[in-house]
Amino acid sequence: MEKNRDKINEFLEQFDLTTLIADGFDEAIVGIIMQDEHPKVVYDEYKCVDILIEEGLAEEEAQEYFDYNVSGAYMGESTPIFMHPISGI
């Protein structure tokens, strides 16, 4: 089975596009969108936090780290999107 990052890279190569991919969160990738002609990788926020917990952070610490250092970081037009899946609301 292909990894999520590989699928995103194949899509980008097919259309000669580039974007930013958040390191360490490949298993949380749910898709890619085009916004104002810029591709953006979409992540499941809850899975991202779970990945941080699996790496050894406490739940509250993982959420705080994610909010400040990951979803709160603006990196330009191709900044990834972190969404709340409807099942988690």
Predicted regions and their residues:
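C-terminal alpha-helical interaction appendages
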Residues: 2-89
